[in-house]
Structure formats: structure tokens, C-alpha cells
């Protein structure tokens, strides 16, 4: 049994006179200890996927179809009381802004102790011992002193390490990390990612890493889902997707990486922008930006099917496939 199994997950947002589709029948599995990257531009549906997995969608968003099974239990429609026993305990989420997680008026120690006591029958002293141990695990110096501090007294990198420590408090089997380093300095980003990778490898925790950065995905994950306009358009081994992308959008993302451009040259870009939820075109959602698009692409939505070593949703994949090194871009 997979740790996490998602089938035909569809999420909609109720608007004044219509509902718009934010996730369109996405499916994937995550095995125990596996690290999965979800990548795409802003508006692709990455964060909505993460919030759906945690059953944290707020109105006007709602799951309109599909299943999310965590260790065999379907969490779609699960009562909040039952979900609380899973969320923060067996599943945990790391947000891109640590101040979303941390309460500014409580000390770090108060927040960690409250989290532990909400899920376990332990004393305050026992909870503080566990909190100190977890802070040491994420390489926070003088952890006993940090328990008495407030979030605003700590640096951004230190706050994010504490958020990771809180996520690990109850030894979860799955961590969902939503752009966990976006708000941090570049050098601190690398440290946090290295820490997260080390912790997942040592404790065999499953990881869903949501990011716009293919470079991060290449270093952190075993498999990758590429999302566009609420759909999965390419899925497979991270190594295969990075080295030999099949979808023109994925090719464009990789060609836009700084290391793909010679010094002094302009960075490559994918022309156009991601459509808004109420403007997703008929057919392939990427067709308005794709130089390979045909009338068939513009009229008929492609299914996600096996091609070579990955699953890809593209009518023209047989015609256009070429190694990234040949300069093919979307």
C-alpha cells in the first residue's frame, strides 16, 4: 500500500456566477520514504494540491471529485475531528513563510509544548525535553534558550529551522513543504534544503516538495510532477525529466535555468503567461504559448500517457521530442 494515493483529484472555486476548476483530475502516488517534487509557475495549482492533501482548503475552494488516500484512509470528506488526528501528527506541512506557522505572541517553547500535548499524554517537562531534542536535530544552537524566545527575536533562517522542528515533533510519515525557502537568503536556502533532505533520508519520511525551482527539484527529489493550469502535464523520474524532458513546457522551464544560458547572454523565457482559472483555453492549456501547437492541440485536451520513460500530456510529443541540448524551447 502506498503512503499516499491521489486519484482524479478535482478542486473547484465557487465564484459569484460560476465555478472554476483549479485542479483537473490529477493522480499520483507517493511511497514510504519517497521524495516527490511538484513544480510549475505561479498559478499552476501546486499549493492548492498541498492544501488539498492536508484537507486545509478554505472557501470558496472545495474538492469536487476524486480521492486522497493516506495509508488507505480516504481523507476527502473526513470529519475535522478525525483529520486533526492525522494533520500535524502523521502528516505535517511546512509553509513558505515561517510566520504563518509561528504565533508571534507565544514563545517557541510554548508553541512546541502545546503541539505535543495536543496529540500525546505527556507532562510539560517531557514535552520540553522532546522540543529541545528536535531543535538540536535541526542544528539550532543553545536550544534550551530558544524555547524562551519569541519568533520576532530570531532570524528568518532560524525561524524556518524551528518550523521544520515543529513539523518533526510528532515523527510524521509525510511532510508537505510548500516553497519552504522562498522568503530566505540564497545561502540560507541551500542550508535549509540540505537539512530537509538529511532529515527525510535519515527518518524515512515521505516528502512532497512544492516549488517553482527545477534546480531544487533536481537535488531533492526522486520523482517529479510538472503542473500547468491545474493539470499534471509530465510525470516521472526526476533524473529523466531533467535530463530528457518530453513536454515543451518542461523543456522551456529547463531552458530558462541560468546554467542553460552562456555568460553575458539574456536568460531564455517561455513566451506568454499562465492563464487564470477562468481563462483556461479549450484543448491543451499550454497551446497558446507553445510553438508546436496545432489545431488539434487547440481543440482537444491531451491525456497523460506513457512516452519513452515518463508520462506526458502532449499530442505532438512524437514530432517535437529532442534533447534539451539542441536548444528546443517552448
Where do the PLM segments sit?
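A short, proline-enriched helix->beta-strand linker immediately N-terminal to the Walker B motif
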Residues: 169-173
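Short catalytic/signature loops enriched in Gly
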Residues: 141-145, 235-330
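Conserved ABC transporter NBD signature motif
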Residues: 63-74
Amino acid at each position: 500500500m502506498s503512503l499516499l494515493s491521489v486519484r482524479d483529484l478535482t478542486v473547484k472555486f465557487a465564484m459569484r456566477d460560476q465555478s472554476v476548476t483549479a485542479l483537473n483530475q490529477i493522480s499520483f502516488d507517493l511511497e514510504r520514504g519517497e521524495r516527490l517534487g511538484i513544480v510549475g509557475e505561479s498559478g499552476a495549482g501546486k499549493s492548492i494540491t498541498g492544501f488539498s492533501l492536508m484537507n486545509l482548503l478554505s472557501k470558496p475552494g472545495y474538492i469536487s471529485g476524486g480521492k486522497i488516500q493516506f495509508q488507505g484512509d480516504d481523507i476527502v470528506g473526513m470529519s475535522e475531528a478525525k483529520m486533526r488526528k492525522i494533520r500535524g501528527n502523521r502528516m505535517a506541512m511546512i509553509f513558505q513563510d515561517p510566520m504563518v506557522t509561528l504565533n508571534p505572541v507565544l514563545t517557541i517553547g510554548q508553541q512546541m509544548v502545546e503541539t505535543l500535548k495536543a496529540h500525546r499524554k505527556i507532562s510539560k517537562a517531557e514535552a520540553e525535553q522532546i522540543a529541545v531534542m528536535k531543535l538540536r536535530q535541526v542544528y539550532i544552537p543553545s536550544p534550551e534558550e530558544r524555547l524562551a524566545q519569541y519568533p520576532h527575536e530570531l532570524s528568518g533562517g532560524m525561524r524556518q529551522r524551528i518550523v521544520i522542528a515543529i513539523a518533526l515533533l510528532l515523527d510524521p510519515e509525510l511532510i508537505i513543504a510548500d516553497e519552504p525557502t522562498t522568503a530566505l537568503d540564497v545561502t540560507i536556502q541551500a542550508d535549509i534544503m540540505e537539512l530537509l533532505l538529511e532529515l527525510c533520508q535519515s527518518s524515512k519520511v515521505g516528502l512532497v516538495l512544492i516549488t517553482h525551482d527545477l534546480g531544487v527539484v533536481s537535488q531533492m527529489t526522486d520523482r517529479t510532477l510538472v503542473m500547468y493550469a491545474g493539470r499534471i502535464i509530465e510525470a516521472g523520474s526526476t533524473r529523466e525529466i531533467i535530463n530528457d524532458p518530453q513536454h515543451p513546457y518542461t523543456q522551456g522551464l529547463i531552458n530558462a535555468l541560468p546554467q542553460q544560458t552562456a555568460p553575458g547572454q539574456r536568460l531564455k523565457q517561455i513566451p506568454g503567461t499562465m492563464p487564470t482559472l477562468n481563462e483556461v483555453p479549450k484543448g491543451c492549456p499550454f497551446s497558446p504559448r507553445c510553438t508546436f501547437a496545432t489545431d488539434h492541440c487547440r481543440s482537444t485536451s491531451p491525456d497523460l500517457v506513457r512516452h519513452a520513460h515518463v508520462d506526458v500530456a502532449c499530442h505532438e510529443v512524437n514530432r517535437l521530442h529532442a534533447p534539451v541540448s539542441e536548444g528546443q524551447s517552448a
